[in-house]
Amino acid sequence: MWSLRLHPSPFGAACQGIFTSTSLLFLVTVPLVCTIVYDSCLYMDVNASRALANVYDLPDDFFPQIDDLVRDAKDALEPYWKAETIKKHVLIATHFVDLIEDFWQTTQGMSQIADALRAVIPPTTVPVPEGFLITHSEAEEIPLNDLFSNQEERIVNFQPDYPITARIHTHLRVYTKLNEQALDKARRLLWWHYNCLLWGEATVTNYISRLRTWLSTPEKYRGKDAPTIEAITRPIQVAQGGRNQTKGTRKPRGLEPRRRKVKTTVVYGRRRSKSRGRRSSPSQRAGSPLPRNRGNQTRSPSPRE
């Protein structure tokens, strides 16, 4: 895609580099602007914002390479594209797939141009220190049209007579680094959204929380292997499968209130429920003699009388 033909004179290479850097300046900063707008406008949910903040804190080597990431995202999005589904995760993931594909190639081309310009830079030229280069956080505060002039002013402050080829190389270095950082942020967002389509947003949030806990735990106190999202979803899948297989053969527990057991006592060889029968008087308890008729009863004389 990228073919660079260097001119034999430093002036020709400088002209070619100036044209390349100025023409690509707008394209370079588009991913940066898109990610800033995304964070401030497109995602206002509190729980999702916390989960995304956790995604930003994960190590860089946790995420797949850009080529593998885009391929996996397309595989996850293909059923939704065919069904023309309009969902939040589908729309945003599709946006980042297109953005990463386009500007990853642009970033690679700029890196190749910067490497080719090294051949025409005077060997005695000292590279511009990091303190004179625009950082990612500073680029968010600088207007887009002032980005080139701001970096040029910093180069002049470092060395007023800095060679023009070295200046172009410095500009390309800065823009490539800014683009790579913006693409890394977009890569993490793409990973989040297409995994939410595969596993569900709640499951991915739970997985990220467990993974961060595992990473923050000292090595001697944590498990040998990091948690996986498959292990989190496996118990749910097994439970659902078990219910489908045993349906109709066993009554599930906990769906109906249990009946209270009725206490019974033995009365003359038969069982009598206390809850169903009325409470008998003290003189008619089980096992007591029948009461005598007091009307016909004559009182025995007292021995004192």
UniProtKB/Swiss-Prot annotation:
Annotated stretches, region: Disordered: 226-305
Q: Where is the signal peptide?
A: 1-19
Instruction: Spell out the InterPro entries in the cross-references.
Output: Hepatitis_core, Viral_capsid_core_dom_sf_HBV
Chief subcellular location equals secreted
Q: Which GO terms describe its cellular component?
A: extracellular region
Which residues are annotated as site, described as Cleavage?
A: R272, S273
User: One of this protein's Pfam families, by short name?
Assistant: Hepatitis_core
Q: At the top level of its lineage, which domain of life is listed?
A: Viruses
Q: What does this protein do?
A: May regulate immune response to the intracellular capsid in acting as a T-cell tolerogen, by having an immunoregulatory effect which prevents destruction of infected cells by cytotoxic T-cells.
Q: What's the protein name?
A: External core antigen
